[in-house]
Amino acid sequence: MSTPRLADVLDNADVIHERAALEAAIEGMADAIRDDYADDARPPLFVTIMHGGMPFAARLAFALGERGLDVEFDYLHATRYRGNTSGSGLAWLHRPATSMEGRRVLLVDDILDEGHTLKAVTRWCEDQDAADVRVAVLAVKVHDRCVDGVCADYVGVEVPDRYVFGYGMDFHEQGRNLPAIYALAD
């Protein structure tokens, strides 16, 4: 089966959040994060969850810098999707090289859907003796299937319980660089 062309999918997709709304939400998140970390003696460890978190993480990092909050960068790559539209078992492709022992860690991801990936990643950070682990996501999907105890500390926008893509989220590995969030047609 061939992968649908993104251009064909976009013709029938709904725009859920325009770029301006996403950037305004990120600015608001940056204010809250700065307030929570401003008094720390050491910059927080800002861990981007690849690949989806990259566009959001870049914009959030700049917004934090504009507010005078320095961060130390690292990344991880753990996925359940691997180019599919539904998840399976978690695969670790890269773990952060920076020691988390005693550190305040900010995990940055594109979306909180059911929470399986974020739960596993958060637990792993805690097992590395992180002092504190918080989660920032661009989007939270609205439904009742989230894993118990999983939530984001900082949320940009809510999205409907549909397949969404753009601004880091992909449709068959396509469309991550779209400047808005779209949903497949019902």
Show the residue positions of the predicted features:
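PRPP-associated nucleotide enzymes
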Residues: 1-186
